[in-house]
Amino acid sequence: MADFTTIARPYAKAAFDFAVEKGQLDQWGQMLSFAAEVAQNEQISELLSGSMSADKLAELFIAICGEQVDEFGQNLLKVMAENGRLAALPDVCTLFFVLKKEHEKEIDVEVISATELSDEQCANISQKLEQRLERKVKLNCSVDEALLGGVIIRAGDLVIDNSARGRLNRLSDALQS
């Protein structure tokens, strides 16, 4: 599938701004998620890349979405269809949720540890990161035994490598230079 990020950005921003203005962020998130799932359907994908007129395509897409998409969501779909951009809906949805998380001061944090973390350890990591990042943190914890010990934390552009493997690699690099 092609990368539609650049194409999707203005649509996502417009939908986000409208949703904020109307106080309907969650509703718009649900609508866009549903429309993105429809757009990713194999049969619908073929229609989107076909030669159907924009009006017919918008009409068909809106009919498939049914009551899952309100009149304002339908207007977005019509505009995207007129511009031949319905295939970018999954990227519009993704970018919308990025904007929503920024707006809600929330960040996804990946925590990779050498062993399974307890609930108490996860809560402690979450609390410390919320203080440091000044955002609400959503932890996604996983285990990688290759780390030997410690953790790696990834939050947006921030990476904290406090693993034994990372320390050994840094020590090795220092000794080689």
Curated annotation (Swiss-Prot):
SUPFAM superfamilies, alphabetically? N-terminal domain of the delta subunit of the F1F0-ATP synthase
Task: Give its localization.
Answer: Cell inner membrane
One Pfam family, please name it.
OSCP
Question: What GO molecular-function term can you cite, just one?
Answer: proton-transporting ATP synthase activity, rotational mechanism
Q: Looking at the keywords, is Transport present?
A: yes
Name the principal localization, coarsely classed.
membrane
Against InterPro entries, the record matches this protein to: ATP_synth_OSCP/delta_N_sf, ATPase_OSCP/d_CS, ATPase_OSCP/dsu
Instruction: Kindly list the GO CC terms recorded for this protein.
Output: plasma membrane; proton-transporting ATP synthase complex
Keywords on record: ATP synthesis, Cell inner membrane, Cell membrane, CF(1), Hydrogen ion transport, Ion transport, Membrane, Transport
The way it spans or sits in the membrane comes to: Peripheral membrane protein
| Alphabetized PROSITE patterns for the sequence | ATPASE_DELTA
Write out the function statement from the record: F(1)F(0) ATP synthase produces ATP from ADP in the presence of a proton or sodium gradient. F-type ATPases consist of two structural domains, F(1) containing the extramembraneous catalytic core and F(0) containing the membrane proton channel, linked together by a central stalk and a peripheral stalk. During catalysis, ATP synthesis in the catalytic domain of F(1) is coupled via a rotary mechanism of the central stalk subunits to proton translocation.
Similarity comment: family membership: Belongs to the ATPase delta chain family.
Description of how the protein assembles with itself and partners? F-type ATPases have 2 components, F(1) - the catalytic core - and F(0) - the membrane proton channel. F(1) has five subunits: alpha(3), beta(3), gamma(1), delta(1), epsilon(1). F(0) has three main subunits: a(1), b(2) and c(10-14). The alpha and beta chains form an alternating ring which encloses part of the gamma chain. F(1) is attached to F(0) by a central stalk formed by the gamma and epsilon chains, while a peripheral stalk is formed by the delta and b chains.
NCBIfam families on file: ATP_synt_delta, PRK05758.2-2, PRK05758.2-5
* Name this polypeptide is given: ATP synthase subunit delta
Give the organism the record lists.
Vibrio vulnificus (strain YJ016)
Gene name linked to the record: atpH
